[in-house]
């Protein structure tokens, strides 16, 4: 990635706020983000939809009436697709929807998604979640101090299991471990909150793509 910009990202600590300079993509490519999201959603598809052909439905193959001299339309067996309960023509069968997306594209997409949140002022780094020990009310108190009031959806990325447990009951918070940070969850939420350990994991993952 050739175009890089220096973003000043706010860092929240028990002693107050400071800023951290970070090199991230200067330009956001919406199509590349779409490609990564499409790849992620394709991987998640179970691909279990299945229909029966006329050869698989539980009907006799006997011709339902003679070809001629009945005054009726010509038909074969009752399992033909034209009849209700008959087989399905070109219906879905179980399949694997996943495909390979180049690792370089995935890394660029992740870097761009985070850069987009930084550019919008929607990225917050956290030094420590002071006072949060696994209870939702503790997280709500911390969130209020951090300026998170539930009016925007938040993606919370931290390796601290107690913090994730405290936040996971809130409908406006999506929690992830640092290794699980992905483009789809970033773009489907409005704010991104990461602790410094998660930020370091992210930097190692994109490794020079920013």
Swiss-Prot record:
PTM note: The N-terminus is blocked.
GO molecular function: rRNA binding; structural constituent of ribosome
UniProt entry keywords in alphabetical sequence: Ribonucleoprotein, Ribosomal protein, RNA-binding, rRNA-binding
BP terms from Gene Ontology: translation
Domain of life of the organism encoding this protein: Bacteria
Alphabetized InterPro entries for the sequence: Ribosomal_uL4 (IPR002136), Ribosomal_uL4-like (IPR013005), Ribosomal_uL4_dom_sf (IPR023574)
Disulfide partners: none
Coiled coil start-end: none
CC terms in the record's Gene Ontology section: ribonucleoprotein complex; ribosome
Family in the record: Belongs to the universal ribosomal protein uL4 family.
Subunit: Part of the 50S ribosomal subunit.
Function, as annotated: One of the primary rRNA binding proteins, this protein initially binds near the 5'-end of the 23S rRNA. It is important during the early stages of 50S assembly. It makes multiple contacts with different domains of the 23S rRNA in the assembled 50S subunit and ribosome. Forms part of the polypeptide exit tunnel.
NCBIfam families linked to this entry: rplD_bact (TIGR03953)
Name of protein: Large ribosomal subunit protein uL4
Organism for this UniProt entry: Thermus thermophilus (strain ATCC 27634 / DSM 579 / HB8)
Gene: rplD
């Amino acid at each position: 990635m050739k175009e890089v910009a220096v973003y000043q990202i706010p860092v929240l600590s028990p002693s107050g706020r400071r800023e951290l300079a970070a090199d991230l993509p200067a330009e956001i490519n919406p199509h590349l983000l779409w490609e990564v999201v499409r790849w992620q959603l394709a991987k998640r598809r179970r691909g279990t939809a299945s229909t029966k052909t006329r050869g698989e439905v539980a009907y006799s193959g006997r011709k339902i009436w003679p070809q001629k001299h009945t005054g009726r339309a010509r038909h074969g067996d009752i399992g033909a697709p034209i009849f209700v309960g008959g087989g399905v023509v070109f219906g879905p069968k179980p399949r694997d929807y996943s495909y390979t997306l180049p690792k370089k594209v995935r890394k660029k997409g992740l870097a761009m998604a985070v850069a987009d949140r930084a550019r919008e002022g929607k990225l917050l780094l956290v030094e420590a979640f002071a006072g949060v020990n696994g209870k939702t009310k503790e997280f709500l108190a911390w969130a209020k101090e951090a300026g998170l009031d539930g009016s925007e959806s938040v993606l919370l990325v931290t390796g601290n299991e107690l913090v994730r447990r405290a936040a996971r009951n809130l409908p406006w918070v999506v929690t992830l471990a640092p290794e699980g940070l992905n483009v789809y969850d970033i773009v489907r939420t409005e704010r991104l909150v990461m602790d410094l350990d998660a930020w370091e994991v992210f930097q190692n993952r994109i490794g020079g793509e920013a």
